[in-house]
A protein has these predicted regions:
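Helix-loop junction within the histidine kinase core
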Residues: 72, 76-87
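Short alpha-helical segment of the dimerization/phosphotransfer core of two-component systems
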Residues: 60-65
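Glycine-rich ATP-binding loops of the HATPase_c
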Residues: 198-205
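A conserved beta-strand-to-alpha-helix junction within the catalytic ATP-binding
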Residues: 86-101, 132
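Short acidic helix/loop segment immediately C-terminal to the autophosphorylated histidine
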Residues: 41-49
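Detector for a conserved hydrophobic position within an alpha-helical segment of the HATPase_c
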Residues: 190-194
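Conserved catalytic submotifs in the C-terminal HATPase_c
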Residues: 86-91, 110-122, 158
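Primarily the dimerization/phosphotransfer
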Residues: 2-42
Length: 220
């Protein structure tokens, strides 16, 4: 709980600093997009290799810029309880298997994700897209990385409290090596999302156990 409180406080501080300096944070990728776009359109002496390199820079910075803005908007909507959800019936074991596949695919095979589940079949009513986005963020690297990594997702059911309990071990998202403003905001988004659906979200301080993330969602 102490770690979760720290995450919440850090995320609030980060968001405040981010909003106060949004023009600076946006300016860097925006300037790269504009600058390299101008080079592509005006410098007739560029060879094919340089054109490809500049195009990749433009694409990467455009993606970063969009993600940066979307995360802050999502966080603001969740905190104001104005987030719109698309609720549907979902089978959780099927969704988890899909997430394991997506983690391997999106990391080009560098994330060796594995699912351990005591739950054979469980239907939930939730926003599957939001759920997938949150869980996938905990399975893959928050920034491009080609290091092989074992990540395990465990799924169990708390019958008494009518909760599904998830535990992700060795998540790159809480690895101190990848700490950043965007990671702190993503963690806060995940916390608010699971709390909205009647669950909880907690990050352990134990480095020895791979900083496990435990979160839950109500089965009602």
């Amino acid at each position: 709980m102490a770690r979760l409180s720290e995450i919440a406080e850090e995320a609030n501080e980060v968001k405040s600093r981010f909003l106060a300096n949004m023009s600076y944070n946006i300016r860097i990728p925006l300037n790269n997009v504009v600058g390299f776009s101008q080079l592509l359109s005006t410098d007739m002496g560029l060879d094919d290799k340089e054109k490809l390199e500049y195009s990749e820079i433009i694409q990467a910075n455009s993606t970063d810029l969009i993600q940066l803005v979307n995360d802050v908007l999502d966080l603001s909507r969740l905190e104001a309880k104005m987030m719109k959800f698309q609720i549907q019936d979902c089978e959780i074991r099927e969704i988890c298997n899909d997430l394991i596949y997506m983690a391997r695919r999106d990391s080009n095979g560098h994330i060796h994700a594995e699912l351990e589940s005591d739950v054979e079949h469980q239907m939930l009513r939730m926003d599957a897209n939001r759920f997938n986005q949150a869980v996938l963020s905990m399975l893959i690297y928050p920034v491009p990385n080609d290091t092989d990594r074992e990540v395990k997702m465990q799924l169990s059911k708390d019958e008494e409290n009518q909760l599904l309990i998830f535990r992700i071990i060795n998540s790159p998202l809480v690895d101190p090596a990848f700490a950043s403003q965007q990671v702190s905001i993503r963690l806060k988004i995940n916390q608010l999302l699971f709390e909205h659906f009647g669950g909880s979200f907690m990050v352990s301080e134990s480095a020895e156990d791979g900083y496990p993330i435990t979160f839950s969602i109500a089965t009602l």
